[in-house]
From Swiss-Prot:
4-CDP-2-C-methyl-D-erythritol 2-phosphate binds at residues 8-10, 34-35, 56-58, 61-65, 142. This is 2-C-methyl-D-erythritol 2,4-cyclodiphosphate synthase. It comes from Brachyspira hyodysenteriae (strain ATCC 49526 / WA1). The keyword Cytoplasm does not apply. The keyword Ribosomal protein does not apply. GO terms for molecular function: 2-C-methyl-D-erythritol 2,4-cyclodiphosphate synthase activity; metal ion binding.
Length: 158
């Protein structure tokens, strides 16, 4: 068993879609970033790579590489899952906390969990997602962006 921790944050931006866990969430703002800026998937990727002691998302998918400009983070997660499988590991479980003031995610959590479980090739019961506010404190509390924390436990397949 190996455990990894991931974190990501992005500022909100106009004229962008809000993509979280590969799902488009209706909102007037999206997240600023080189790719689709899916902070949930980015934190998840970092937790998997961290568990494998293989660095972080930027070392595998650099934001100064034009081939990743606007890319769906689902593609990056699929590549990360392939790396994990090549190392003979699979997800035991992952626990994700999304911190933002708006929009409220309650109605999207189950769809987000289902989408991630398919990409991770694991049962939905192994994927936990929670959404919290920052109680109006700091830049996230002022609604300027989002932060995501993720911990993943990997188990050997062989």
């Amino acid at each position: 068993m190996r455990i990894g921790y991931g974190y990501d944050s992005h500022a909100f931006a106009e004229n962008r879609k809000l993509i979280l866990s590969g799902i488009e969430i209706p909102y007037e703002l999206g997240l600023k970033g080189h790719s689709d800026a899916d902070a949930v998937i980015h934190a998840l990727i970092d937790s998997i790579l961290g568990a494998l002691a293989l660095g972080d998302i930027g070392s595998h998918f650099p934001d100064n590489d034009s081939k990743y400009k606007g890319i769906s983070s689902i593609v990056l997660l699929e590549k990360t899952v392939s790396i994990m499988e090549e190392k003979n590991y699979e997800i035991s479980n992952t626990d994700i906390t999304i911190i933002l003031e708006k929009p409220k995610l309650r109605n999207y959590i189950d769809t987000m969990r289902e989408n991630l479980s398919k990409i991770l090739k694991t049962d939905i019961e192994n994927v936990s997602i929670k959404a919290k506010t920052n109680e109006k404190m700091d830049s996230i509390g002022r609604g300027e962006g989002i932060a995501v924390h993720c911990v993943s436990l990997l188990k050997k397949t062989k």
